[in-house]
Amino acid sequence: MSSEQPAWTFGLFTPDQNKQAPLEMNENAINSLYEAIPLPQDGSSNGQRQEDRQANSFELKRETLVATDPPRPTINLDPRVSIYSGRRPLLSRTNIQGRVYNFLERPTGWKCFVYHFTVFLIVLICLIFSVLSTIQQYNNLATETLFWMEIVLVVFFGAEYVVRLWSAGCRSKYVGVWGRLRFARKPISVIDLIVVVASVIVLCVGSNGQVFATSAIRGIRFLQILRMLHVDRQGGTWRLLGSVVFIHRQELITTLYIGFLGLIFSSYFVYLAEKDAIDSSGEYQFGSYADALWWGVVTVTTIGYGDKVPQTWIGKTIASCFSVFAISFFALPAGILGSGFALKVQQKQRQKHFNRQIPAAASLIQTAWRCYAAENPDSATWKIYIRKQSRNHHLMSPSPKPKKSAMVKKKKIRTERDEGSTDKMLNIPHITYDHVADDRKNDGYSVESYENTVRKPFGFLDPSTGPFIRTSSFTDDLDMEGDTLLTPITHISELKEHHRAAIKVIRRMQYFVAKKKFQQARKPYDVRDVIEQYSQGHLNLMVRIKELQRRLDQSLGKPSLFLSVSDKVKDKGINTIGSRLNRVEDKVTQMDHKLNLITDMLHHLLTNQQGSQSIRTPHRSNSLNSENHPSRNTLPTYEQLNVPRMTQDNIS
């Protein structure tokens, strides 16, 4: 292998030397573990190889499988994970059941919306024709049209019920006969079955030619009303209503209880006041307590039919007072339910916005952990880049394969017929592993394992096994004689330092991308959410400010604690900084006062001493006595006091 060949790639193989695949790293050094397959440099060798393969087409049909994918870009991924593969996904019975079940029971997308909306329109049109059949002017036309529409709807809903029952087998709890019975016991399934069976009975028994009997038309109208329940098969509206009522059950019970008490009392007092009153026609308006209750229900619900009206002024006064009180309580449940629905919708929007953050947060956590785990060279995080060797799938088998079954041969011929035209458009034939269905008996592969293999993400360091050929012919062995295969990594020790460095760089980039996506998912989605976020932030800020103020008051102290006259209040703030500073100021003031007093005394004594020295006494005895017994009031002068201190300062 020349030094210009790429030593290794991230699971990609580039047949064109001028175009390099993304995430490809080139090295000049020869790597024994990763060697690229040398490709022919001119077109003549390609044509010669193509002619040789066409000459041995019969033998290749028996022993090899040549991939004939449609034209695709120069990047050739592994055939199991190639996004350019022309193979259609395998359709099985379980797969079809799941798709039909999701289409009918879990509608998502515009196709499901169009189907279910069309069914709703058909049911609504049938109901409109049923209403028109009650009008004398449109009776004949509506009845005849309704007859044929009922036949079509019965056949359609019957077939749909059977399909729903069959498709429910894709779920584990509806598998088998007992599972189907469990599915048929669902309330909406029971309603569908009743509508279908009753419609068939009405069409068979209650019709004469193309005309319905009167009783049959009544039954058809009732069944058409039941068909409207078919629109909401999931019961989302009923669940939403039930959740709102359950959340606000306490408020609803309170208002209904008080309103019911007001209804009973108002009806009873009006009955006592109006039981003997006679109206203009000579009849009793409130002849019984039941008439009074009917009047109360009509009044407090703000319907007001006017069939029962109080006649006396006492009854009118009682009715006015109780109506204002009772009507207000009977109107409260509507407001409670309305606010509950609004809060429920807002909660669903927030939950939907929060659900968008879960994948972004999980991706961020995963990428952060992988960046952390990549720092350890012996970590198990490197195992995802290692490909396990297949035990039963050998390349270049020396022994010929046994004969395939007739079904496998037909499938191979059909695949070659569908994709044979695309093989001529390729300059280099892409040869892959045998199809999974061809090696099912020998290699033990299944459709489920194939689908799981396709879904499994491959590491970008897995070298592409490239276009391989499985053959035992001597001619093809000569063709592949000079080719060198890329050896897959089978152990962590085979990962080089540049491999690990590239993995760390890519993981760090994935971390930054996941972080950006998570920050975008965390952004508020509504103005109300922004306002709530700001109000929550303001509340947190005020809480922190109050906590800081409390700590400052605890450390510094409030002025009212240490400036108060009461000793009990002073004791509360004795350990605060303010109290200590206040005590220091008091001590400084006392010291200043004492120093002023001492200064005045010294000045007074100095004045007295100077006056006593000016008067000289002639008696020596007095002078001797004064020398031997100095006066207690005699103090040193200011200069005498300063001289030792100045001397001490000079010494220091």
From Swiss-Prot:
Disulfide bond residue pairs: none
Residues exposed to the Extracellular side: 133-143, 209-216, 274-289, 311-312
Keyword hit for Zinc: no
Region (C-terminal assembly domain (tetramerization)): 578-609
Region of interest: Disordered: 393-419, 609-652
Residues in the bilayer without spanning it: 290-310
GO aspect biological process, one term: renal absorption
Residue numbers on the Cytoplasmic membrane side: 1-110, 167-182, 233-250, 339-652
Pfam families for this protein: Ion_trans, KCNQ_channel
Membrane topology type: Multi-pass membrane protein
UniProt region (Interaction with CALM), positions on chain: 360-372, 504-518
Biased composition (Basic residues): 401-414
Region (Interaction with KCNE3): 228-236
Residue ranges of the region described as Interaction with KCNE1 C-terminus: 524-561
Stretches the record annotates as Interaction with AKAP9: 577-605
GO cellular component: basolateral plasma membrane; cytoplasm; cytoplasmic vesicle membrane; endoplasmic reticulum; membrane raft; monoatomic ion channel complex; plasma membrane; voltage-gated potassium channel complex
Position of the signal peptide: none
Binding residues for a 1,2-diacyl-sn-glycero-3-phospho-(1D-myo-inositol-4,5-bisphosphate): 234
InterPro entries in UniProt: Ion_trans_dom, K_chnl_volt-dep_KCNQ, K_chnl_volt-dep_KCNQ_C, K_chnl_volt-dep_KCQN1, Volt_channel_dom_sf
Domains: entry comment: Each channel subunit contains six transmembrane segments (S1-S6) with S1-S4 forming one voltage sensing domain (VSD) and S5-S6 contributing to form one quarter of an interlocking pore-forming domain (PD).
Assembly behavior: Tetramer. Heterotetramer with KCNE1; targets to the membrane raft. Interacts (via C-terminus) with CALM; forms a heterotetramer in a calcium-independent manner. Interacts with KCNE2; form a heterooligomer complex that targets to the membrane raft and leading to currents with an apparently instantaneous activation, a rapid deactivation process and a linear current-voltage relationship and decreases the amplitude of the outward current.
Family listed: Belongs to the potassium channel family. KQT (TC 1.A.1.15) subfamily. Kv7.1/KCNQ1 sub-subfamily.
Entry protein name: Potassium voltage-gated channel subfamily KQT member 1
